[in-house]
Amino acid sequence: MTADNQTARRLIELNTEFYRLQAASFSQTRHSAWAGWERLADGLSLGNHAKVLDLACGNLRFERFLQERFPRTRLEFDAIDNCPALSAGAEGIPVRDLDLAQALLEGQGPELSEHDLAVSFGFMHHLPTFEMRCALLELLARATAPGGVFAVSCWQFMDDEGLAAKAEQTTARGISELGLTGLGPRDYLIGWQTRPGVYRYCHHFDDAEVDALAAHLAGRAQLVDSYRADGRTGRLNRYLVFKRTRLG
């Protein structure tokens, strides 16, 4: 475990407050589809109708990407997030308001029906413990129909020299300003647009941890793809793509 429950709870609250207060400016910088989504889509066979789950859907740009990429498929979305302001203005796609990080910390993940595709992008790095990250994978597996696909992204921002330097600086400053203790290895506090006192908690994934996450589902899901994509370097996220076999 990278953080005790008290620290984990505080980090979750920090992120909830960040997105609540910075939703407008954050969403304005989040319009383009991720390059890594294209590779995922290349391997999908969604047919005429597909149920899609998106955990921590943000401003619904993945939903818009799928609609453009699969115009002949009737897509039925189950989108979940705990920041309604991020999806404000989006039409035709209802979003369920749920604090998923808090639910995973308490071991109370939501009951979900089975989907043809289940994803969670830009969220895994906001989960403060390895156990919670495993729980997210288990939740996605349970919410995927046999033969269906589920995928996650793991942010590897410390592999980018510029991002790493900023993360080191903002983390030191944030720990001092917030009086935080208990951060684990590869845990950072990231600033936002040089705004004073504004931080969000993010975890950097090294390849060993990503491999351990993939191994956690051995026997319950088949890892069908693992690759790096996104950002200026094309390597900012590591993706794990699974095919649901059975539940264990």
Task: List each language-model region with its residue ranges.
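Short, charge-rich binding segments
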Residues: 110-111, 142
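A conserved beta-strand element that flanks and buttresses the S-adenosyl-L-methionine
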Residues: 119
